[in-house]
Amino acid sequence: MEWMKIDQVAKRSGLTKRTIRFYEEIGLIPAPKRTDGGVRLYSEDDMEELEKVISTKEVLGFSLQELQHFMETSRQLELNKEGYLLSLDPKERKEKLEEIQETLNHQLDLIDEKIRTFQSFKERLQGMKGKAERAIQSIE
């Protein structure tokens, strides 16, 4: 397995080293392996997890708190999926599927709330644009 130091991860992700350390500190990404000297070593899996955080933040426009919550539910979803795949008991598999469904509903609720916020902001901007257009017309 090939390991990357934080400089390489920062360059590849487009984030600063400080941001990567902060994401680790607040639990957005798992703590990487460390050398005996304390140097962080990141695997390709760590990089993929960081890329998930970045894309979720960029696409959904979540605050750090919302992002933490969303990523935690994503991790819970993965655990439930693993539990479902490992179980042979139909009752247990059904319970895992219900937990997966509940987690997905929660994530969809978070996204719906963000969409409502964007829609409200868009409506305010459209109102301001309309006022500006009317003001221009009244001057002409």
Swiss-Prot record:
Pfam families, per the entry: MerR_1 (PF13411)
The HTH merR-type domain is annotated at 1-73
Induction profile: YfmP is autoregulated. There is no induction with copper or other metals.
InterPro entries (alphabetical)? DNA-bd_dom_put_sf, MerR-type_HTH_dom, MerR_fam, YfmP_HTH
Q: List the disulfide bonds.
A: none
Annotated region of DNA binding: 6-25
Q: Which PROSITE patterns match?
A: HTH_MERR_2
* Keyword Transcription regulation among record annotations: yes
BP-aspect Gene Ontology terms: negative regulation of DNA-templated transcription
Residue spans crossing the bilayer:
none
What does the further note read? Binds a DNA inverted repeat of the yfmPO operon.
Q: What does this protein do?
A: Repressor of the yfmOP operon. A mutation in yfmP leads to overexpression of yfmO, probably causing a decrease in cellular copper that is eventually responsible for a reduced copper induction of copZA.
State the protein's name. HTH-type transcriptional regulator YfmP
- Source organism per entry reads Bacillus subtilis (strain 168)
